[in-house]
Design a protein with these regions (language model features):
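A short, Trp-centered hydrophobic/proline-enriched beta-strand micro-motif
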Residues: 12-21
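Short, exposed beta-strand-loop hairpins at the edges of beta-sheets
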Residues: 25, 69-77
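Amphipathic, interaction-prone secondary-structure segments
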Residues: 26-50
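Generic preference for hydrophobic/aromatic residues in regular secondary structure cores
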Residues: 14, 76, 84-85
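Structured surface patches comprising rigid loops and adjacent beta-strands/short helices at the edges
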Residues: 33-39, 53-71, 81, 88
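N-terminal helix-cap/turn-to-beta initiation motif at the start of protein domains
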Residues: 1-12
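Glycine-centered tight beta-turn/hairpin loop motif at sheet-sheet or coil-to-beta transitions
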Residues: 22-24, 51-53, 78-81
Length: 88
């Protein structure tokens, strides 16, 4: 989570690719571009806000950070919902 926050602090309007799945592998959203205009760092979650006002709430206690051939990736899990984000 600290690496994600440092990335958000380092630049304006950072773009992530976002993938959202349910536990049964139902695809809710895939490879959506999400431009972070602002963010809120709360005790138990972080809220990413797009310039159109839409937001994505990510639970801190469900965060797993990993690296692969695509670079920096984060997985957030809450209940049966999983959100994967990675820097474009």
């Amino acid at each position: 989570m600290e690496k994600l926050l440092s990335l958000l602090n380092a630049s304006d309007d950072i773009v992530f690719n976002v993938n959202i799945f349910l536990e049964d592998d139902t695809v809710m959203l895939t490879n959506a571009k999400f431009t972070v205009y602002d963010y809120y760092d709360e005790d138990d979650h972080i809220c990413l806000v797009q310039d159109n006002g839409a937001s994505l709430v990510l639970p801190k206690d469900g965060c797993v950070y990993f690296e692969d051939e695509e670079g920096d990736n984060w997985r957030f899990k809450q209940g049966d919902l999983e959100v994967y984000i990675y820097e474009e």
